[in-house]
Amino acid sequence: MGEDRRSLRVDYDDNFLRNNICSLKVSFIKQQGGAEGVKRLYADLGLALVALIWGSTFPVVKIALDSMSPFAFNTVRFFIACLFFLPFLKGWDFKDGFKIGIASFLGYTFQTVGLDYTTATNAGFITSTYVVLAPIISWLVYKDVFDKRDVSGVLLAFVGFYFLSGYSGFNIGDILMLFCALFFGAEIAMISHYSRLSNPTMLAFWQSFAIFILSAPFAVFTTTKFEINTTVILCLLITAFFATFVAKMLQNWLQSYTKSSDAAVILSLEGVFAHLFSVAVLAEILTPVQYFGAFLILLAVIIVSLRV
């Protein structure tokens, strides 16, 4: 009899626990606006992970450049990334992806070379201005809808750039990063245009292939250092697998579940994560004026993304 009571008690506790968990799940789903809201929440969290991965690569690439020249690094990085994409290819239509890859190649070239001349923190924040520049480029090239507030975002971003650079004259690294942001803005505008017609994974592969094939000739003639060691191999794997293959696959998949404005704001956290990783790994510190500049850049990105 005692055993029966204990058994009933256990069954009651189990049912009570299951019912409470179910109630919590239902309550959570309602709070998030239904099943679609939950999907959007998970998508936003996933995109935050993408921003974290991208932000972490700035100090990683800067470390790798101590042992390998910029074009050589990009050649090897994107060759490895292409290998990861191969199992997911569906056809060989390269036209649109290769076009985007040309803009990507120029963006990564300016970014990687620029990291030799500026801090990883500056590189991260200045690169994030591609969110501000993309709508302007879309309007100029594809005649997309233009919002006048995009202009205020650009102006605010340039003021932030001025303060982030120390307002005593721009260094070559920061200027190269600005060109990097310009071409990444073009890349985003082109992806928005062509992804309506093409498979996102195919676009990502051909982007990577274009960067690899265009970087290789420059690597042959400009490489002054090419040291393969454990640190460089680790940096290559982090940037090729996590920052290129995993991040691109996640981005292409998750952006279909959330609003583009939300995605842009979340991905702009790349600059914040770049700073946090740079402080932790490279012990980089900004002055109060530079922090103000970084804040203005982040604010500009939010204004353009949310149209506030």
Curated annotation (Swiss-Prot):
Belongs to the EamA transporter family. InterPro entries: Diverse_Substrate_Transporter, EamA_dom. The chain crosses the membrane at residues 45-65, 69-89, 100-120, 122-142, 151-171, 172-192, 201-221, 226-246, 263-283, 285-305. Disulfide bonds: none annotated. Keywords: Cell membrane, Membrane, Repeat, Transmembrane, Transmembrane helix, Transport. The keyword Transcription regulation does not apply. This is Uncharacterized transporter AF_0788. It comes from Archaeoglobus fulgidus (strain ATCC 49558 / DSM 4304 / JCM 9628 / NBRC 100126 / VC-16). GO terms for cellular component: plasma membrane. It comes from the Archaea.
